[in-house]
């Protein structure tokens, strides 16, 4: 087992992301944004500079976590699908150069003006995800699906249906402990309750190959819409983080665990002031504190953290 992190929540530039990673004694970054650019959108010169910086620092990319079929992509819009496909085709050769074998992908947004799981719409979603996964499979890349604000994130049932429909060894699950804290369990009739992280995790455990650590609290809204989360340190919200970490240990989990705090900056919030020195300093310090608190939580859950590099084993 190893630790990683979305270090762009600490620093926008790669040098800063490498710095906080090494300060923690870790060796991996889950790459998302570098100075506002993605692996699939930076030019060749920018990528070569990134590759050199990582090599010199001895830091690796365990997963590319960006915009493929995410919550901004409509399943009915072919231009959204083509954008995801283009990003994937651009990113894969660069992932291969970096030795990165996992992509964090999703399963398109849930439309507000129609049922998100009608048989007709499911057919569209399954076909498009299948095509993206096939590209990954043909290139030795694993498509790790995250339970976010997407079709698969509607409930554990939808995620399991997606697994059955895609039916590929290159399609596995990235389980995010915090996303069920504010996503609705869209099964049965409205009003839908908020999901249980523990239920989602337990139902999908056999397919989970990577874990994102996030935690939050949220109260149901009177109108039945998705509630607004307040992000917390891991273990302080309703994400069942401790129970999940104990179960991962007891079930012999040996994959990666990536920090995605959101307590210093909400990645989806484009209006936040991210440029002030005070904001930059806060994001860096809160990211480091989050990661250190989580490693302590891991020890409390029976994990033994082995030396440098962010590796762990069960006690």
For each feature predicted by the language model, list its residue ranges.
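Active-site beta-loop-alpha junctions enriched in small/polar residues
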Residues: 6-10, 32-34, 66-69, 108-110, ...
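Short amphipathic alpha-helices and their capping/turn segments at secondary-structure boundaries
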Residues: 14-22, 43-58, 87-98, 157-166, ...
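Hydrophobic faces of well-ordered beta-strands that scaffold small-molecule active sites
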Residues: 1-7, 29-31, 61-66, 103-105, ...
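Acidic/histidine-rich catalytic cores of soluble enzymes
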Residues: 120, 130-238, 242, 304-305
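Active-site acidic/histidine proton-transfer and metal-coordination neighborhood
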Residues: 11-19, 55-56, 73-175, 281-286, ...
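Glycine-rich, proline-tolerant flexible connector loops at the mouths of alpha/beta enzymes
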Residues: 31-55, 108-113
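Conserved, mostly hydrophobic/aromatic
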Residues: 21, 29, 54, 95, ...
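C-terminal helical cap(s) of enzyme catalytic domains, especially alpha/beta-barrels
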Residues: 271-306
């Amino acid at each position: 087992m190893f630790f990683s992190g979305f270090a762009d929540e600490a620093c926008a530039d790669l040098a800063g992301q490498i710095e906080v990673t090494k300060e923690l004694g870790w060796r991996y970054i889950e790459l998302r944004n570098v100075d506002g650019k993605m692996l699939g959108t930076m030019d060749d010169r920018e990528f070569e500079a990134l590759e050199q910086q990582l090599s010199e620092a001895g830091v690796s990319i365990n997963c590319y976590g960006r915009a493929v079929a995410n919550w901004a992509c409509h399943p009915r819009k072919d231009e959204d699908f083509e954008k995801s496909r283009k990003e994937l085709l651009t990113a894969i050769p660069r992932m291969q150069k970096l030795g990165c074998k996992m992509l964090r992908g999703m399963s398109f947004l849930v439309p507000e003006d129609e049922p998100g799981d009608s048989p007709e719409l499911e057919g569209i979603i399954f076909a498009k995800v299948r095509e993206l996964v096939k590209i990954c499979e043909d290139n030795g890349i694993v498509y790790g699906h995250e339970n976010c604000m997407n079709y698969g994130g509607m409930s554990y049932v939808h995620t399991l249906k997606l697994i059955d429909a895609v039916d590929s060894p290159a399609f596995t699950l990235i389980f995010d402990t915090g996303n069920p804290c504010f996503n609705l369990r869209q099964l049965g009739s409205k009003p839908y309750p908020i999901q249980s992280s523990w239920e989602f995790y337990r139902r999908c455990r056999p397919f989970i190959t990577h874990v994102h650590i996030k935690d939050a609290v949220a109260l149901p809204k009177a109108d039945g819409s998705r509630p607004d989360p307040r992000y917390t340190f891991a273990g302080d919200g309703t994400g069942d983080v401790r129970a999940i970490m104990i179960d991962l240990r007891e079930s012999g989990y040996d994959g990666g665990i990536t920090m995605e705090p959101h307590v210093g900056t909400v990645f989806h919030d484009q209006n936040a002031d991210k440029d002030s020195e005070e904001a930059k300093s806060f994001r860096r310090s809160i990211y480091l504190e989050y990661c250190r608190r989580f490693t302590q939580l891991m020890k409390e859950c029976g994990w033994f953290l082995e030396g440098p590099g962010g590796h762990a084993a069960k006690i």
